[in-house]
């Protein structure tokens, strides 16, 4: 349901978005479009003015959220199954690149805590792998990824207001992992 918050009334309803349990939404820089990441692996681009689905794709078997680059050109989905992230062109939802979360040979992790950083970068946690990864999409089809140890089961993450530090709560132990992204 789309709501006009100034008038406090619903103005449209958009269906066909898949499994929305634990879904998340990010918005284009001009706030015209919303990108909905569904639990069923669906990624939907919505036109909020036209109240319609522009495009919907099934990009994984089980997704948990996503983010959009600071310039608004890249939408990234974080996935449980298969573990990893996928980057898409924000206009067309064309797949640009995939970064599998293979933390050891043949071992893949659920990805959680995805957050956008300056310079077309994204930070995220590998729940099963105990790591934080930082992927640079300055060349969207050839991302470069750095890996950092994080502790047991890093989970939800966020970036500090100055954009410098990425923090991930540790589900498997008492504590918080902090990565200086500069």
Question: Where is each model-derived feature located?
Answer:
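Predominantly soluble domains enriched in secretory-pathway, periplasmic, or organellar proteins
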Residues: 1-182
